């Protein structure tokens, strides 16, 4: 099965959503599934890119056989409603644009607490006519 997972956070970020998603996807790969992550370049919580990363339109990375596509977003520190919302909405649009080109997907998963990842994942599932899973771990804001 090919799982497309939409998440705003993924390692090397060390927050709970990033670690949780990594642990889930690593187990799915160990069990023979193909996993593609669409996320942004690591910058949480300070809004500064981690060393070795750029905020480019698309960057491919593989960690433990997990396919990771990092997409361009508006990057800001984790403070202030307006800037954070622009960051989240920019990720939603970027993940939709690049998610459309992910081939042969069997299921699309979107994770909270970032609300706009859910919209992106739902939209991609509808376009691809595959099941949508909403992983609710935290209610935002």
At which residue positions do the language-model features occur?
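N-terminal subdomain of nucleotide-sugar transferases
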Residues: 1-64
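A short, structure-level motif marking secondary-structure boundaries and short turns
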Residues: 9-11, 81, 105-107
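Short glycine-/acidic-enriched loop or helix-start segments at secondary-structure transitions
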Residues: 15-16, 47-48, 80, 118-121
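A conserved catalytic-core segment of Leloir-type glycosyltransferases
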Residues: 39-99
């Amino acid at each position: 099965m090919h799982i497309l997972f939409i998440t705003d956070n993924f390692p090397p970020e060390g927050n709970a959503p990033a670690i949780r998603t990594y642990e889930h996807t690593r187990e799915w790969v160990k069990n023979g599934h193909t996993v593609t992550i669409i996320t942004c370049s690591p910058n949480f919580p300070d809004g500064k890119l981690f060393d070795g990363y750029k905020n480019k339109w698309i960057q491919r990375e593989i960690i433990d056989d997990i396919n990771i596509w990092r997409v361009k977003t508006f990057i800001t520190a984790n403070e202030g409603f307006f800037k954070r919302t622009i960051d989240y909405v920019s990720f939603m649009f970027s993940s939709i644009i690049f998610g459309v080109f992910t081939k042969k997907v069997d299921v699309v998963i979107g994770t909270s607490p970032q609300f706009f990842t859910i919209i992106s994942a739902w939209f991609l599932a509808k376009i691809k006519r595959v099941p949508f899973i909403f992983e609710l771990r935290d209610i935002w804001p």
